[in-house]
Amino acid sequence: MDRLAHDLEDKLASLNSSKAKVGDGHRPCSIIVGKVRDLTRNVDSSEYDPDHVAIGPYNYPRPQSRSPHLAMEHDKLASLDLVLSAAKAARPTMTVEVYVKELACLERDTRNCYANTFDDMTSEQFVRMLLLDGCYILSRLVGLRAHHLDLDDVGTAEASVSSANRAEALAVVRDVFYLAENQIPFFVLEKIGELTTLDGKDRVFTHISDYALDLMRRQKYATAAPAMVPPEPIVPGNLLHLLHMHLKPVALSVSPSVPVSTVDPVYVRRWRSATEYNFAGVNFKARAMSEKGLIRCILDVKLDVGGGTLEVPCLDIDSETWRLLRNLIELEQRNRETVGSHVTAYCVFISQVACTTKDVELLSKRGVIVHGHGNNEEVAKCFADLCKGIQFDPDDPSCNYLRETCKKLEKRFQSYPRRWIAWLMQRYLRNPWLAVGLLAAAIGLVLALIQTVYSVLCYYKQ
């Protein structure tokens, strides 16, 4: 027993030593990158695995991939050569040794940005990975032209890879931006940029941020630059977090600062399907992204004052939509206190509202959903699987910014008079001939009642 106690004391001492090192003057890590849990990954593991390039310690060494196009060691070495050539144009004495030493100083900060400790990776392996992966990302996203860092011509994904085709460019963007595990801290990219040009740190931040905004606009996910919501950091933790920063609703239904106990204790449980809401008289309307100041991204769902129309920004679904949404959810699952749960709340909403083929068909007709899949059933299945395995409390206003909207819609659905009127409108009044017939029958009934009343009155007067 004494041996056991001694062993536990040693481990506690080691643990306390590790905690002390985190706060010994090194920068705190704002965004933690963790391994996707099996419960979530098992729904569709391909949505979390890289197809073109493996980045970061979770994918080191090169993972076993079904894709034959995964970037090899020589591809990343070629990127290092391009970055070094650009650096020597500004600083002729620049060497690889300088990069290695500078990144070695960031090793502890970088390791603190991951949920795993990676004790099996030596310092040399870890720094080597950071340097090669960082150079690969910068050379692809920023671009290297004529042996200098061309940060003034970021452009589109197609233009950022001068020697490859559009498909390769899109594959790079997908892997380095969209995947939760496939990340290295943003400050590593800034450090490499700082060593490469005189003002490289600021320029890397500015131009990669512009690149991300252009990407979100072209995919129709967001239209405006990020709006900072405390306590979220101003500087992105990694590239996926940079995309996440663009997805903030303009106005929250309930302020996150409001204690749960002060909110109306009505449980929302879950959203009803689009067809159920439609049966209760709720209309769905596509909300235009052109409403400047009123809508910033696809999360800006709005219920009109009367509660009869739910305005939802159009979700343009392509082959990468599910991958991006799933990985954004994973980012929030790991960093809820820092980044919130807005994307998760939106995904829970849209996945429950559009969970059947008829729901997708209805929302497609209203312009809320646009997709290029083979059929609506396939899209409905993807929506139904979107939030499997996640942890989310719909009754917590700090998690669910759409809680008040859900409550109002539920009250409308539970109102029998509204449902009867809605049923009458949908069953009869949408067909003009049926409406005319119903009106004529109603007029005839009223006239018959009037005639009966007059007949009774005349009888008593006699």
Roles of regions detected by a PLM:
Residues M1-V436, C458-Q462:
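Non-transmembrane
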Residues R427-Y428, A442, V446-Q462:
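C-terminal helix/juxtamembrane-tail motif
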